[in-house]
């Protein structure tokens, strides 16, 4: 088992970790030596990670953000997943607060074609 001692009154503490279920100590050490995950942002406003081998990026914006992270900005709190492959770009969007009753507008830092499929 593992634990991270946050202390009695942590303030502005920052850390990142990845869960590796069913991995041995040797497998965990090997992953640690050459991690697949790249932390793109880890602030109170946004957390973002990119998994290189899977070409997947996950972002949690806890507030609107005009400053792009991984080429993405949002006008409301949003959880965004992106995967790009030879078929194109797949994006998933949801509200991490579960309070939004309207829309979430995401802006990408590049041109994309018309959506092939979307949910209203």
PLM feature spans:
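Terminal accessory/anchoring regions of large secretory-pathway or extracellular enzymes
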Residues: 1-120
């Amino acid at each position: 088992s593992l634990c991270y001692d946050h202390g009695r009154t942590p303030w502005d503490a920052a850390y990142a970790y990845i869960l590796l279920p069913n991995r041995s100590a040797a497998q965990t050490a090997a992953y640690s030596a050459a991690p697949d995950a790249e932390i793109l942002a880890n602030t109170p406003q946004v957390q973002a990670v990119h998994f290189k081998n899977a070409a997947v990026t996950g972002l949690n914006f806890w507030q609107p953000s005009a400053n792009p992270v991984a080429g993405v900005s949002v006008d409301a709190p949003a959880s965004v997943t992106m995967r790009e492959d030879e078929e194109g770009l797949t994006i998933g969007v949801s509200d991490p607060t579960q309070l939004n009753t309207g829309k979430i507008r995401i802006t990408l830092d590049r041109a994309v074609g018309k959506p092939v499929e979307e949910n209203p």
